[in-house]
C-alpha cells in the first residue's frame, strides 16, 4: 500500500520518508511530520516520518491495519503524503508555527486536513480518498457525533467528487 500511494507522488521520490508502525497514536490513525532533527535543515534536506497506528480505535470499534481494506489504506497514506507535500515549502520556523496552530486552532486543522486531501486528489488519488471517507462515514458502528466531527474537519465525499470532476 505504501508503494502504491507513493507512486502518485513522483516528486517525493528523493525525499526521505520513513513509514513506521506505532502501538498507539493519540487521536489519530496516521500522522505525518518532519523528523525532529530535520525541522531546521534546508527544506530540500528535511526528512519525514509517517507514523501508522498498529491498533486503531474509533469509539468502541477496534481495528488493526489488516482489517482495513487495501484501497482505504492507500487513501489514508495518500492523505498523509499530502501533508508531506504541504510541509515541503515551509521553513523550520514556519513548521513550528504550523504545529502550534494545529494544536490550538480548529480552523487551522480544517484548513490543513482539506489541503492534504486536495494534494492527494490533485495527484490522482481521488477515488482512494473517496473510499477512505466512505469507509468511515458508512460504518454503522460509529456515532453520528463522531461522523459530524469528521465532516466538520475533512472534505465530504461530495466535495471530493466535485474536485475529481473538476480535475477531469
Report each predicted region and the residues it spans.
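Post-HEXXH active-site segment of zinc metalloproteases
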Residues: 71, 86-114
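A metal-dependent hydrolase signature that marks the N-terminal structural subdomain at the beginning
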Residues: 1-45
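Active-site scaffold of zinc-dependent metalloenzymes
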Residues: 31-70, 87
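Short alpha-helix carrying the canonical HExxH Zn2+-binding catalytic motif
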Residues: 68-85
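An active-site-proximal "capping" alpha-helix that borders the catalytic cofactor pocket
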Residues: 109-126
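Short, contiguous hydrophobic alpha-helices characteristic of membrane insertion segments
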Residues: 48, 72, 144-147
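Long, well-structured alpha-helical subdomains associated
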Residues: 125-168
Amino acid at each position: 500500500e505504501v508503494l502504491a500511494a507513493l507512486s502518485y507522488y513522483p516528486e517525493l521520490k528523493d525525499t526521505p520518508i520513513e513509514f513506521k508502525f506505532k502501538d498507539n497514536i493519540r487521536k489519530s490513525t496516521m500522522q505525518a511530520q518532519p523528523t525532529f532533527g530535520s525541522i531546521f535543515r534546508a527544506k530540500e534536506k528535511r526528512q519525514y516520518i509517517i507514523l501508522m497506528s498498529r491498533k486503531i480505535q474509533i469509539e468502541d470499534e477496534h481495528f488493526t491495519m489488516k482489517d482495513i481494506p487495501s484501497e482505504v489504506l492507500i487513501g489514508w497514506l495518500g492523505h498523509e503524503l499530502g501533508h508531506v507535500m504541504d510541509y515541503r515549502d515551509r521553513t523550520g520556523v514556519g513548521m513550528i508555527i504550523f504545529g502550534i496552530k494545529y494544536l490550538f486552532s480548529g480552523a487551522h486543522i480544517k484548513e490543513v486536513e482539506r489541503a492534504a486531501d486536495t494534494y492527494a486528489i490533485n495527484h490522482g488519488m481521488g477515488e482512494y480518498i473517496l473510499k477512505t471517507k466512505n469507509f468511515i462515514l458508512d460504518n454503522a458502528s460509529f456515532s453520528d457525533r463522531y461522523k459530524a466531527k469528521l465532516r466538520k474537519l475533512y472534505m465530504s465525499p461530495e466535495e471530493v467528487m466535485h474536485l475529481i470532476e473538476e480535475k477531469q
